[in-house]
Amino acid sequence: MSKLKLEILTPNGVIYNGEALSVTLPGEEGEFGVLAEHSSLITLLEAGVIDIEKEDKSVESVLINWGVVEVDEKKVIVLVEGAVAIRGDSESAVAKALNDAKELIESIKDNNPAIATVTARLESAAQNLL
């Protein structure tokens, strides 16, 4: 399966920069998936979870508050105001990532009625990591 280049950027720096088999994004009209050779598009993203399927078939999740994505045949660039990668090499690192994600959820809770879905996805991602 072909790979695509993925970058997730915030004003504070790079959250993810690497290759992926597929990316699922929380679009304004609903979730959508991107594979290599996808048609070009630029669209808005809502608060939600970006799922990144890596070459080894593992999935990494990144919680975002909102942003914009540019897709072309070989690359996906995601610009977001705030993001937390749900990953870590130890239980304490995962716990810190989950705490950061919960703080991000609290900051967007009043602005987005779909926050229950985001919370459920976050809890699911947490279970997969522990």
From Swiss-Prot:
Gene3D superfamilies: F0F1 ATP synthase delta/epsilon subunit, N-terminal. It comes from the Bacteria. InterPro entries: ATP_synth_F1_dsu/esu (IPR001469), ATP_synth_F1_dsu/esu_N (IPR020546), ATPsynth_dsu/esu_N (IPR036771). Pfam families: ATP-synt_DE_N. GO terms for molecular function: ATP binding; proton-transporting ATP synthase activity, rotational mechanism. It is a peripheral membrane protein. Belongs to the ATPase epsilon chain family. F-type ATPases have 2 components, CF(1) - the catalytic core - and CF(0) - the membrane proton channel. CF(1) has five subunits: alpha(3), beta(3), gamma(1), delta(1), epsilon(1). CF(0) has three main subunits: a, b and c. This is ATP synthase epsilon chain. The gene is atpC.
